[in-house]
Amino acid sequence: LEAMENVTFRARMMGAGVYDHGYVIGYERVNDHQPGAPGPRHRLWRIRAGHVVTATGAIERPLSFAGNDIPGVMLASAIRDYAVNYGVSIGDRTVVVTNNDDAYLTAICLKNMGLDVPAILDARNSGGGELAEAAKALGIRVETGKAIAKVIGGKRVTGVGVCAQAGQGAVLEEIDCDAVAMSGGWSPVVHLWSHCGGKLVWDDVYSHFKPDVHNPPKGDHGEAFVSAAGCAAGSQTETDFEGLSLHETFRTATESAHAAVKALGRKPIEVSVPTVQEHDH
C-alpha cells in the first residue's frame, strides 16, 4: 500500500468521526511513541471521501459472575494477546470460561506455551467442535453446561467456584487457579457506522447488534456512502465454528471494496476470495 501512488497510508491514526457528505475526521498520533522527538504530537485530518469503508473489527464481551473484577480475571483474547505478542503470562494456571468457540484458542495457546489450563467451562450444552477435541487431546478438561458461580480471592485470583449454567448458581466444585480467561462472544464495533446515521439490526445467532446493510448511512442524494467489512459487518462465520472467521473477513472486505469503487464511478476488478485455514492452533 505504501508503494502505491494513489494510496495515502497512515499508521497510528483512527477515524474519530464520519459526518454528512463523506466528511471524515482522522486523529493521528504522530509522536506519542517518542515524546522527545521534534514536531507535533498529534495531527487532525479533515477528509472528504466519496465512499467510506469501516473495518473496525469487533470487541469481546465479558461474562457476569461474582468477583469478575478481581485482578487476574481478563478477557480471553487479551490473555492470548499478552502471551503471543509479548511473551507475558497473566497466570500459571488459567481457567477458561466461555459461551463460544474462540476462547478455546486461548486455552490451546496457553497449553502449547507450557502453562496449565485445568478446565474450560463452556456454558453451552455442546460446542467447541474440533477445537474442543484439540483441547482434550492436550489434556485440558472440558466441561459443557457449566459456568463460574464466583471467583475465589481478594487481591488476586486463587480459584473459582463452578456451577451449572442452568440453575440457581450453587457451587458444585472449586478449582484452584491464579487467572481466569472469560469470553462472552464478540460484538461488531459499530460506532462510526451509527455516528453517520447507519441503522443496526439484532443478530439472534451471535446475540449482538450489527450494521443493517439495507439501511446504511446515506448521502444527500440517497446513495449509501458507508459500507462495513469484516467483523465490523457482523459476518463472522459460514461454518459450524462460532467465532471470528478469516474467510468472512476477506469476503466482506472484497464486497466493500467493490462498493467503494462503484460509488466512485469506476469498474471493480474481479478477484477471488483467498483460501484460508480457520482455527490456527
Stretches found by the model and what they are:
Residues 1-281:
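Residues forming the flavin
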